[in-house]
UniProtKB/Swiss-Prot annotation:
Name of the featured protein: Vacuolar membrane-associated protein IML1
UniProt cross-references to Pfam families, sorted A to Z: DEP, DEPDC5_CTD, IML1
UniProt biased composition (Polar residues): 47-60, 747-766, 787-804, 840-853
A single cellular component GO annotation: GATOR1 complex
Length: 1889
């Protein structure tokens, strides 16, 4: 369970004694100026602690016990190892009888391998390698140490191996270099000899789906409190496999270490989904800056991508790759922006650029590769290069086609001229649609719990861009993307092609959002990438240094004439932010073949650091500079600062020397050394009364401040006067606050007068994170401006700010009173905020009385602004140079001589907002630095926190402090997922890892290695870590979060549990569920700080037997949601949900429309099509109370609130398959085999159905008959589609809800016994009405054949079980049924009492299944009048026998299947008879499926019940697909679900059924889920004729009718190409019947079909066209398996099979193996030679139409028995489906049929077709097997585009109906004639007779 925070050392030590980390040094402070080498060292020191170890943590940290351990090893006794070669459950066993009492059973013991003398390192070594030798020696010691739990050998082993001392399993011995006879030492683990705890453990897995809950359970079950070592194989629950690939101890790789409570597991997937986005910006066509002669795109396609794919191939990973090219095209209409506003808002455009010339633009996306296996990287690169040739042309000319006029005339001519004037070109990368692409990629997998792929884990998005890592974005897009990525587990990697820039990356620059009420004033701000120093109006937040480009004078001089120098609108405030969810890297070229990763706070790579310190490389290429001959070899003119002889270099260098001990000043005060780089040019000042920098200097020492001041005085000479403009602006500066009164135009609740980016003002920010303090917090005031700024600041201005537990540092350093830059009077503001109210306390300075505090209400009706709030490390624009140097807000005006800075508190919601000067009630969201480590706070005259709380409470009671606002400002909304800083000068020494990487922090073992990182992240993406250390600070937690509490307790009446769950188990379930939903456990001291406590009792998540007691909590977070799970009241779990407040509304800009309208061209599209996506729709909040109640057992219904996993499967009927099960009776046709396969599956489902304990108890205490299996699955088989059956036979359908069977309710007879059977009495009982306990007997139709007064074998089996006391199961009942059959020989002899019933066709013995039987003539009762609606002699029969069953009421009993009258009907709603009218007000309800709880862990490998909900069809047509759907919520291991599905697939494959996963949504709706996929439309070249076929049978009659079904010809085409029905459209069902499934109502718009291979879906639209879509859920690993097996089978068949074996009617020389021979789960289906057994459903097997050699018109219908996939010549050039060469199966030599019995006579003609490409019979197999969907699509399209073939096909359909007229007269099963020329009745009537 969750570990406690690391500041609770006692708990840590008691939990795992002796655990220690590696070396953890507290490195000294570095001062501001340092060289590049010292810069590197400081980075190493900054990262020396393990991630998350804060200085405030009180955890005990021990040194690595290398020296102490080695000394002990020399004196300890050695023991001998014996290797256990057999399979052992225990890894290490100790013979404690020989070892002694030093080691107790159950204690931790370390096994150290004693080095041999030859392995010891040499004693002499170079001194400079001393540290390396020390580390290597320590590592060597660690590598040979194995820690285990001591366990004594069993007595039998001791008796057998009496001399064995240490018994080690072989895999452990191999990993630690132990052999038989190896000497080891045994050392108990205690505080003197601690175990070396691993900081990170990496595990890799492949070909399986692991949820994060699975990862947690695996870590706890197999890794926790054990030694882990590199190469270790981990097997969890016997099915989940993973391998330990790396072990880290404090960032250093180790061979092994102990997995303790602080160890962080990192799971990496080698079978993930990759989406590669390539930004085709304008720079992609530019030449490389390095002068290599390559354009950018060539570097991508010839450099990076081949290197990436080769890495994948070397690691043998199995990823699915999707590649999308995206670009933004800007349009220059040739007129000014003002005049072009109307055209800019044309519906064609996606939006309008907010920068530069505000050009309209259109976003384009081109899908090049869609979910292709990573092994086919050569095809991927070829497709990329091919698409590159056309991409630029397509996107540049698309507007001419999309905007072309539709009408003719003069207007259209003028519009065409205007279109030709429009200039279209790709935008620069900085202005591209970068965020939109990421947002769309994240939407791809936002619902990954639907259609769950059980073979892949993880999604990784890689964006390849020609940008150096800088993007200008819209605030809205950044906020949406940030919120989307903060809550999912998608990793985003940015690969930049240019060189690494000199500033921090990745960088997003955006304008502050404009809130309603703010005045927007247009002012051109140049944000072009080509800005030069000559430009006066500069970009805020750019890459220039603060002292240069952003000096106040330059900005003032850049003001245009007539433009006021007052405050500009917030739209022109630029903010530079770094996202936490984006990891950037730079492709450095093919020579290095490695990625140079750019850390957030690191600005240069190693290659740059190798340059001499006095050489400055020019990194930007400007045209003006190049024309002035400024080349790379020129030296910079300005000398470095330290080369000046006047510069106090020695003082600066001396100040960088670390001081290990605290010093005392002259007054005896403690001088605490800095733990980070000082934030100002001078050292920290500790006095608060006056500015005295020399106060703390030592006697006789000149302070560094004084030396730097002298240097400034020497070099800087201020001008003696100022010009008029400066004087006027200074005056305006002073008068602006008075003019503004209570106005506020800034989104942050602060306004300002002059936007001079003096960095001193940026110190007004409240406390920043101790790890990531942006550069802007350092005081870097240019000396030239110091006095002028002081002169301008002689007025005290109201300042809106917020203050956590201490005041902002800059406020404590500088006062802006009339004293200029002096030390402010002591004042500290504290804030203590609760959810109900919030406020802050004000500390009065000694020089001011409480009378100076005044409360000023704001103007009624005016919208107050929020005070400044910055969110966790992402201080947004307040830290950027665009922010106000000094913020002024309306408030009380103090005298000008006041040294204090009044801070206004404002309320956004209350009209009379009370304002309290002095501090803000709104705390910043920046993480507070540890209070104990802040010397300014500890050693000042600040007020105590408890006193401040008292003062605050008194003010709160007095009503002086308003409530907190209910919304957050737009700036705060981006925090803490963005880090705002000055990109050109970041603070490199204060990087908060929890802030920097947020969710991904614990993935990186060594953060300091981010500059150069290999390919691990790109080759095997990591899952979101289980733990995180980020937690909001106390102030932001109280001010920005709302609390929602509730309690959860276990439902003790839950039926699913044998024993109710304990609270520990319930808590584990709640934690596991949240893990699977993306939550992370929060560890570290941040939680305790946020709650204002020294420590918080938290559970240890990685402990196996950690007992939960009241008061223990677990904190979990995801995005803006925090959950606190606490144990309370002995048995309950209290859940506190903290949700961040919503973002404050603001007016959207005109360039951000509500709907995003890009142009997308999918893989198969011929052109771009504009699509609309709603990216603004808010995400629905989840009802966690309901979810937790479901886990606790209070409800068991899976609803959409739960976001449960779900997957849909179909069983596709295959042709030419035989059952390979031993003992299967011969004589079954294909249809009967498939039905038998479904029955076997149903028995498996029934066997492993989860039975609740109460039912089990009833079965245990009930009679014998209660234990019998009564087959409750109750599947009804029909030979028509469900819609037709419901419309025609509603009343007799047992699926009808609200009805009740009365069978077995009346029993007036004694039960029978198989020992003494009276056949007459038994026959009488069988033939009773169903209400009286008889067997259901009725007329049944199967296809076109009618059987009178018959029953079904499964019904009889259930009846025998119910009426015989001595039958135990269905097998015995089936055996009894066989005894009751009439034997064939007895019937021929005419003997009496030979049996009760016979098979209707006399082909089968009695079997439990869908077999029809009739009572023999001897015992058959005469039918009373009205028993049947039709007489036997009639040729036509109505479909619904009305007198068969009396009306029923109540709910039907589905204890056994009940067959119904069968008949045929057209596949259309036009001739479908209406269902019987329901009573007024209520529709009859029909449920087509049923759900059961299925146990996926019947082998009991888990510690808890593992259940899924299995939905199965109850009404099934064997010609169509059988549907399955599984839903699950909290299964322990997802691999259990996959194992069950594989078992089902294996079982079904032996009965001619293929199990394939298909999407839950229909094919036409794929674009709503995946914007980069679209169904492919195929139109018919010739529309189908309106004339109907001559003969067609109505469902109510056998007489020929002339009413064809709607889309009759389209369905015939699909059946011709081996498509079978998957799901009917909702409109097909009768409108007067309430039809539903167990999972919901039918919602398909079109009827969907699926190919028998399972690889492609097809739909028929309302206008008669086809929509085709590849089934990407079809498991890709089946392709390779089928390819290998087919090639092998082909080789074998060529050698062994003779010409007489093959396809019937074709007699091919080889047995063709179709691609459908293998299932998605690599299960081969039997493929014996086809025989001439009867086929009851000819519609499934299209029979070749044999024609003479001279017949060409029938060629289109001469398709072979096989799938069209195996006929590649139809797609070959020059060959059309209508040609003679397309007849038959290409590549096969057909021999004439020599009169096979029962077959129509074939011609003697021999048709020979060459294989495509001229190869042999198997030449094409290896290429098209992986392209099944493309082959099927191409073949179907070629046929539909061939007008001659279509017309011939239509004629065939019309004339084929004539052949069926005799089928009704013969009285036998008339075969389905759709598309095939001859009647099946002719072929099989002779045999059946």
């Amino acid at each position: 369970m969750p570990p406690p925070p690391r500041n609770s050392s006692s708990a840590s030590l008691s939990a795992t004694p002796g655990l220690a980390k590696g070396p953890n040094n507290n490195w000294p402070t570095h001062l501001r100026h340092f060289r590049r080498s010292s810069h590197d060292r400081s980075l190493e020191h900054a990262y020396s602690n393990s991630p998350g170890d804060t200085v405030s943590s009180n955890s005990t940290i021990r040194e690595r016990p290398s020296s102490r351990l080695s000394s002990r090893l020399r004196t300890e006794r050695r023991w001998t190892v014996t290797v256990n070669e057999s399979l052992a459950r225990d890894e290490v066993l100790l013979n404690l009888d020989l070892i002694g009492d030093d080691i107790q059973p159950g204690s931790l013991v370390a096994i150290d391998v004693v080095k041999a003398d030859s392995e010891k390192p040499l004693q002499n070594s170079h001194p400079r390698h001393f540290q390396d030798r020390k580390d290597s020696a320590t590592a060597g010691c660690v590598e040979r140490r194995y820690i285990c739990v001591a366990k004594d050998m069993p007595k039998e082993l001791k008796a057998r191996y009496a001399s064995v001392e240490v018994y080690v399993a072989k895999h452990v011995a191999d990993a630690f270099a132990m052999r038989k006879g190896t000497q080891v030492t045994l050392t108990p683990i205690d505080e003197n000899n601690p175990a070396l705890e691993a900081s990170h453990v990496e595990l890799c897995f492949k070909d399986q789906y692991l949820s994060r809950a699975d990862m947690w359970r695996m870590a706890v079950g197999e890794l926790a409190e054990r030694t882990v070592y590199k190469g270790q194989m981990v097997l969890f629950m016997g099915t989940v496999k993973a391998q330990v690939t790396a072990v880290y101890v404090d960032g250093r790789k180790a061979q092994s270490a102990f997995f303790g409570r602080h160890t962080k597991p990192v799971f990496r997937s080698e079978s993930a989904r990759y989406v590669l986005f390539i930004q085709m910006a304008r720079e992609m066509w530019d030449f490389d800056q390095d002068g290599s002669g390559e354009i950018m795109f060539n570097k991508v396609v010839n450099g990076f991508l081949p290197a990436l794919f080769k890495k994948w191939a070397a690691m043998k990973v199995k990823h699915l790759v999707t590649i999308v090219l995206f670009a933004r095209v800007e349009y220059d209409t040739g007129i000014s922006t003002e005049l072009a506003s109307a055209s800019a808002h044309h519906g064609y455009y996606t939006g309008v650029q907010a920068s530069e010339d505000q050009r309209p633009y259109k976003d384009f996306y081109r899908v090049v590769v869609s979910e292709m296996g990573s092994g086919e990287w050569t095809r991927i690169l070829h497709q990329l290069k091919r698409e590159f040739n056309y991409f630029r042309k397509d996107i540049s000319t698309y507007h001419q086609k999309a905007m072309e006029p539709t009408n003719s005339g003069e207007d259209s001519g003028e519009q065409e001229v205007l279109l030709n004037r429009i200039k279209a070109e790709a935008s620069r990368a900085i202005h591209g649609n970068f965020l939109e692409a990421i947002n769309m990629a994240s939407s791809l997998y936002a619902h990954d719990y639907i259609d769950r792929d059980l073979t892949r884990t993880g999604v990784s998005v890689v964006v390849i861009s020609p940008s150096p890592g800088v993007f200008e974005v819209e605030y809205d897009a950044l906020r949406r993307t940030t919120e989307a990525l903060a809550c999912n587990g998608i990793g985003i990697d940015l690969i930049c092609i240019p060189n690494i820039p000199l500033h921090s990356v990745p960088l997003f620059r955006y304008r502050n959002p404009r809130q309603p009420g703010q005045v927007q004033r247009k002012s051109k701000v140049d944000i072009s990438q080509g800005s030069t120093p000559k430009q006066t109006t500069l970009t805020f937040g750019s890459y220039s240094s603060l002292a240069g480009s952003y000096s106040p004078n330059k900005r003032i001089e850049g003001s245009r004439n007539g433009e006021p120098a007052g405050p500009l609108s917030s739209q022109e405030e630029w903010v530079s932010a770094i996202p936490q969810w984006l990891h950037v890297s730079y492709w450095t070229g093919a020579s290095e073949e490695e990625l140079s990763y750019q850390g957030i706070a690191l600005s240069v790579s190693d290659a740059t650091q190798k340059l001499p310190s006095d050489e400055f490389p020019i990194r930007c290429r400007m045209y003006d500079l190049q024309m002035r001959s400024v080349m790379e070899t020129n030296e910079i003119e300005t000398k470095p600062l330290h080369t000046d002889p006047c510069y106090p270099l020695n003082a600066v260098l001396a100040s960088q020397i670390s001081k290990p001990h605290f010093d005392l000043d002259n007054d005896g005060n403690v001088i605490i050394p800095n733990a980070r780089v000082p934030e100002t040019l001078f050292d920290h000042v500790f006095g608060f009364q006056k500015f005295a920098p020399d106060r703390h200097r030592k006697p006789g020492e000149k302070s560094i401040w004084r030396q730097l001041q002298e240097y400034d005085d020497c070099r800087a000479r201020l001008p003696s006067h100022r010009n008029a403009n400066q004087t006027r602006r200074c005056r305006d500066h002073e008068e602006t606050p008075r003019r503004q009164a209570l106005e506020d135009t800034s989104p942050l609740g602060t306004s300002y007068t002059d936007r001079r980016p003096s960095t001193a003002s940026q110190q007004t920010l409240p406390e920043l994170s101790p790890y990531h303090r942006p550069t802007s917090q350092r005081l870097e005031v240019p000396p030239v401006n110091r006095k002028s700024m002081s002169a301008q600041s002689n007025k005290s201005e109201p300042k809106a700010s917020s203050s956590p537990l201490k005041a902002p540092k800059f406020m404590r350093h500088i006062s802006l009173g009339n004293r200029g830059f002096g030390i402010a009077a002591p004042k500290v503001a504290t804030a203590e905020v609760s959810m109900e109210s919030a406020g802050a306390s004000k500390t009065l300075t000694p020089s001011r009385s409480s009378q100076d505090l005044r409360v000023t209400p704001s103007k009624p009706g005016q919208r107050p602004s929020s005070s400044r709030r910055l969110t966790g490390g992402t201080s947004t624009s307040a830290l950027s140079p665009a922010l106000s140097p000094f913020s002024f807000a309306p408030g009380p005006q103090f005298p000008t001589d006041s040294p204090t800075r009044p801070i206004v508190i404002r309320n956004q919601q209350l009209e009379p907002a009370a304002m309290l000067s002095g501090s803000s009630i709104l705390a910043t969201t920046l993480r507070p630095e540890p209070v104990g480590h802040d010397r300014d706070f500890r050693y000042s005259n600040a007020i105590r926190a408890e006193d401040a709380k008292k003062l605050y409470n008194s003010k709160l009671l007095a009503g002086a402090i308003p409530e907190l606002p209910s919304t957050l400002s737009p700036k705060t909304a981006l925090s803490p997922w963005l880090t705002v800083l000055n990109p050109s000068n970041p603070d490199t020494n204060d990087v908060d890892m929890a802030m920097l990487y947020s969710r991904w922090q614990h993935v990186f073992p060594r953060p300091q290695e981010m500059r150069i990182m290999k390919w691990k992240g790109l080759c095997s993406p990591a899952a979101v870590p289980l733990t995180s250390e980020y937690f909001p600070s106390r102030d932001q937690f109280e001010a920005q979060y709302e609390r929602q509490p509730y309690n959860v307790s276990q439902d003790f009446d839950e039926e699913l549990q044998e024993e109710p769950k304990s609270r520990d188990e319930l808590l584990r379930e709640l934690v596991s569920l949240r893990f699977s939903q993306g939550f992370q456990i929060v560890v570290g001291p941040a939680v305790a700080k946020a709650f204002g406590q020294k420590q918080v009792k938290v559970a240890d998540i990685f402990s196996r037997n950690h007992m939960m007691e009241d008061g223990i909590s677990i904190f979990m977070s995801v995005g803006n949601t925090i959950h606190q799970l606490s144990c309370v009241n002995g048995t309950e779990v209290e859940v506190n949900i903290f949700v961040r407040k919503p973002t404050d509304s603001f007016g959207p800009s005109f360039s951000s429309p509500t709907l995003y309208k890009p142009a997308i061209r999918t893989l198969l599209d011929g052109g771009y099509r504009t699509s609309e996506f709603d990216l603004v729709a808010p995400k629905a909040e989840r009802n966690w109370n309901y979810i937790d109640a479901f886990i606790a057992g209070h409800n068991d219904e899976l609803t959409e609130h739960l976001r449960f996993w779900r997957a849909r499967f179909v069983l596709i009927p295959m042709t030419g398959r035989r059952s390979s099960m031993p003992g299967t009776e011969t004589g079954d046709n294909e249809e009967e085999i498939r039905i038998e396969g479904i029955r076997k599956l149903a028995q498996m489902w029934q066997k492993h159905r989860y039975v609740p304990p109460n039912e089990r108890r009833l079965q245990g205490s009930g009679s014998t008959r209660s234990k019998k299996d009564t087959n409750p699955l109750d599947i009804v088989y029909k030979t028509e589609d469900a819609s037709v059956v419901i419309a025609a036979e509603l009343e007799t359908l047992p699926l009808l809800e609200g009805l009740d069977r009365k069978g077995q309710l009346v029993r007036n007879r004694e039960p029978f016994s198989k020992k003494n059977i009276n056949l007459a009495a038994l026959a009488e009982a069988m033939q009773q009405p169903v209400e009286n306990g008889g067997v259901r007997m009725q007329n049944r139709r199967w296809h076109f054949r009618l059987h009178y007064n018959c029953f079904i074998g499964s019904d009889m089996t259930s009846w025998l079980l119910d009426n015989f006391d001595d039958l135990e199961d269905r097998e015995e009942a089936e055996a009894l049924g066989k005894r009751l059959m009439v034997p064939d020989d007895k019937e021929k002899e005419g003997k009496k009492d030979s049996g009760l019933f016979v098979h209707v066709e006399k082909r089968h013995q009695f079997r439990d299944g869908q077999y029809f039987y009739q009572i023999s003539n001897e015992f058959a009762k005469p039918h009373p009048p009205g028993w049947f609606n039709a007489k036997r002699g009639q040729g036509s029969m109505p479909s619904t026998p009305m007198g068969e069953q009396p009306p029923r009421d109540g709910r039907p009993s589905f204890s056994r299947p009940t067959s119904i009258h069968e008949e045929d009907s057209p596949e259309s709603g036009e001739t479908t008879p209406t269902a019987p009218q329901a009573p007024a007000g209520n529709k009859p309800k029909v449920v087509l499926s049923r759900v059961i709880k299925y146990d996926v862990d019947h082998r009991k490998r888990s510690y808890r019940p593992e259940m899924v909900e299995l939905h199965y069809d109850r009404l099934h047509n064997p010609d169509n697909c059988y549907h399955l759907r599984i839903d699950w919520m909290n299964v322990t291991v997802q691999k259990l679900v996959e194992d069950v599905i594989e078992n089902w697939a294996r079982e079904a494959g032996q009965y001619g059924l293929r199990l394939v996963e298909v999407p839950i949504a229909e094919a036409s709706a794929i674009s709503e889920i995946n914007p980069f996929r679209r169904p492919y439309k195929i139109k018919l070249a010739v529309p189908p004729p309106d004339q109907s076929p001559v003969t067609y049978y109505d469902p109510t009659s056998f007489t020929p009718q002339a009413h064809p079904g709607r889309q009759f010809y389209q369905k015939a085409i699909l059946r011709r190409f081996d498509f079978v029905l998957d799901m009917e459209a909702a409109s097909n069902f009768p409108s007067n019947v309430d039809v539903s499934y167990s999972w919901g109502r039918p919602d398909f718009r079109y009827t969907q079909y699926i190919h028998r291979s399972g690889s492609i879906l097809a739909e028929i639209t309302d206008d008669g066209h086809f929509l085709v879509l590849a089934n990407r859920l079809y498991s890709s690993r089946a392709f390779a398996a089928r390819e290998r097996e087919m090639q092998k089978e082909l080789r074998v068949e060529r050698q062994e099979q003779g010409p007489a074996i093959g396809t019937p009617g074709l007699g091919s020389s080889i047995r063709v193996i179709t691609p459908s021979s293998y299932t998605p789960y690599n299960i081969p289906t039997p493929l014996p030679p086809y025989d001439s057994s009867p086929v009851a459903s000819p519609a499934l097997r299209p029979v070749t139409t044999t024609t003479t050699a001279t017949t060409t018109t029938a060629a289109p219908t001469s398709s072979s028995l096989l799938s069209p996939v195996v006929r590649p010549t139809l797609s070959a050039p020059g060959t059309t489906p209508g040609s003679t060469s397309a007849s038959g199966t290409p590549g096969l030599t057909h021999t004439p049929n020599q009169g096979q019995p029962g077959k129509p006579p074939s011609t003697s003609a021999t048709t020979t077709t060459a294989c495509a490409g001229g190869g042999g019979p198997g030449s094409g197999w290896s290429t098209w097997t992986t392209r099944e969907p493309e082959w099927i699509k191409d073949e179907l399209e070629n046929f539909c585009l061939d007008a001659a073939a279509l017309e011939a096909f239509y004629r065939e359909l019309r004339t084929a109906a004539r052949a069926t007229t005799s089928a009704g007269r013969c009285g036998h099963d008339a075969g389905f004639w759709c598309g095939w020329r001859w009647c099946w009745c002719w072929g099989w009537a002779r045999e059946w007779d």
